[in-house]
């Protein structure tokens, strides 16, 4: 029997459209995020980190060029993943499909120009509301995944599933994680032998016709 594995990948979200200033982002949040995750990568060679938003990378390149070169090294070593595909984590309710598509194009073009790779997902931890056509827009952009934690804050219809296939009205579909837990969620203890994680993923996948790699 093939051994089943689930991987945990760390992430950090710096909200550059929230109510603090760009100066706060540049002077406080970016260097703190970089230093902590650089230390973790050096201490744990198998540590993996997702960081989204091409705009944040632009700020790093402008204000912390040495750190930007270090990120390039970590990307080559597959410790660091430019994620989210978009240039900025914008609202996806009011903007037109073309606007969302251009946001993806700008973001992934930046990733390709600077790191030689493109992201395959949309990561929107802090946006409220996701239209039914979003899977079609994401799929047509050549992406395969979507993640949010915002539904844990509240939803008129609840959380449809934790992990599974999200299908647009026209039948286009993407893999989606709708319940990535809130920012304050803590996972305690050693979960390496916790089969409930695998079983939970398998159950959700079965209910939404999601193909798993086992």
Predicted regions and their residues:
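Catalytic-domain carbohydrate-binding cleft regions of carbohydrate-active enzymes
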Residues: 1-214
């Amino acid at each position: 029997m093939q051994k089943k594995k689930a991987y945990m990948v760390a992430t950090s979200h710096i909200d550059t459209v929230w109510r603090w200033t760009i100066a706060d982002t540049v002077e406080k949040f970016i260097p703190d995020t970089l230093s902590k995750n650089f230390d973790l990568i050096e201490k744990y060679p198998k540590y993996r980190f997702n960081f989204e938003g091409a705009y944040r990378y632009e700020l790093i390149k402008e204000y912390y060029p040495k750190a930007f070169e270090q990120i390039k090294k970590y990307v080559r070593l597959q410790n660091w993943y430019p994620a989210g595909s978009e240039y900025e984590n914008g609202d996806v309710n009011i903007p037109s499909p073309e606007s969302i598509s251009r946001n993806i194009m700008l973001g992934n073009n930046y990733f390709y120009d600077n790191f030689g790779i493109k992201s395959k997902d949309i990561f929107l931890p802090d946006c409220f509301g996701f239209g039914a056509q979003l899977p079609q827009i994401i799929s047509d952009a050549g992406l395969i995944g979507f993640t949010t934690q915002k539904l844990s804050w509240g939803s008129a219809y609840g959380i449809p599933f934790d992990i599974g296939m999200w299908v647009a009205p026209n039948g286009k579909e993407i893999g989606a994680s709708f319940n990535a837990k809130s920012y304050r969620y803590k996972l305690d203890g050693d979960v390496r032998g916790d089969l409930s994680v695998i079983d939970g993923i398998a159950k959700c996948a079965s209910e939404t016709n999601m193909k798993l790699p086992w």
